[in-house]
From Swiss-Prot:
Organism of provenance: Yersinia enterocolitica serotype O:8 / biotype 1B (strain NCTC 13174 / 8081)
Keyword Ribosomal protein: no
Taxonomic lineage: Bacteria, Pseudomonadati, Pseudomonadota, Gammaproteobacteria, Enterobacterales
Protein name: Malate dehydrogenase
Gene giving rise to this polypeptide: mdh
Quaternary structure and partners: Homodimer.
Short name of any one Pfam family annotated for the protein: Ldh_1_N
């Protein structure tokens, strides 16, 4: 099993690489790539951790050596948010970075599962899909926008509010991965109920949690450590599914039946070929139904921006 992390020298990439080095199955290969010259050193640093995960680092313009033979590619390359920016302000820089890296994936490991972390995810996933399509290698079951951070934040905030253990809570989060497009389905958590005001406040906090971190870091960065953890959780779920484990379910931003939008975050069953099944989002509360309808314009525009960028 070979996993490649692109953007491995950044805050998210290093946290993700550390978690993968300690948690990937024995005998796995972990390949780190970043344009930054420090990347081979990050790999050497991590290689001193005593786990049976083989690690190599590559830097420079060419990601090909890192991508050769990869089963899973996780992309965290790009610039981070600063105070006053929202995820869409990142588009101008990150769109080009994602296009370039996905072109290299299309040439080098076209059958790999691809997980996109680089923001704005609503748009960068659409860019990746169009690049793969142009190259004639697009498989909609193998491209994922990683929205797991919304899930783990939801689990944490609900547990805090209700005095529960966070590991016992799993909140499905649908829609997209920015602002109003993030919709936690709080009505679907077994055995937990909320007042109307709690739902409004929690939903808003989950939607704005990224900004909470950006502001708390006072210009020194965005959510890197929690995002690294979220990406590792999703990446390890992909590994387990590829190894034939059954019933691996995660929420992710994927191309589906287009009922709400071409790309939509929803619970998915993972299998040996990526998405095995897109699960129904279930019954929504009136609040959730309204929130879903309200987000679709924004989501459609985000997706179109990505499609137009490649065309």
């Amino acid at each position: 099993m070979k996993v490649a992390v692109l953007g491995a020298a950044g805050g998210i990439g290093q946290a993700l690489a550390l978690l993968l080095k300690t948690q990937l199955p024995s005998g796995s290969d972990l390949s780190l790539y970043d344009i930054a010259p420090v990347t081979p050193g990050v790999a050497v640093d991590l290689s001193h951790i005593p786990t049976a995960v083989n690690i190599k680092g590559f830097s420079g313009e060419d990601a090909t050596p890192a991508l050769k033979g990869a089963d899973i590619v996780l992309i965290s390359a790009g610039v981070a948010r600063k105070p006053g920016m929202d995820r869409s302000d990142l588009f101008n820089v990150n769109a080009g970075i994602v296009r370039n890296l996905v072109e290299q994936i299309a040439r080098t490991c076209p059958k790999a599962l691809i997980g996109i972390i680089t923001n704005p995810v609503n748009t960068t996933v659409a860019i990746a899909a169009e690049v793969l399509k142009k190259a004639g290698v697009y498989d909609k079951n193998k491209l994922f926008g990683i929205t797991t951070l919304d899930t783990i934040r939801s689990n944490t905030f609900v547990a805090e509010l209700k005095g529960k253990q966070p590991q016992d809570i799993e909140v499905p989060v649908i829609g997209g991965h920015s602002g109003v497009t993030i919709l936690p389905l709080l009505s679907q958590i077994p055995g937990i109920s909320f007042t109307e005001q709690e739902v409004i406040d929690l939903t808003k906090r989950i939607q704005n949690a990224g900004t909470e971190v950006v502001e708390a870091k006072a210009g020194g960065g965005s959510a890197t450590l929690s995002m690294g953890q979220a990406a590792a959780r999703f990446g390890l779920s992909l590994v387990r599914a590829l190894q034939g484990e059954s019933n691996v379910v995660e929420c992710s931003y994927v191309e589906g039946d287009g009922k709400y939008a071409r790309f939509f975050a929803q619970p998915i069953l993972l299998g040996k070929d990526g998405v095995a099944e897109r699960k129904d989002i279930g019954k929504l509360s009136a609040f959730e139904q309204q929130a879903l309808e309200n987000m679709l314009d924004v989501l459609h525009k985000d997706i179109e921006l990505g499609e137009q960028f490649v065309k």
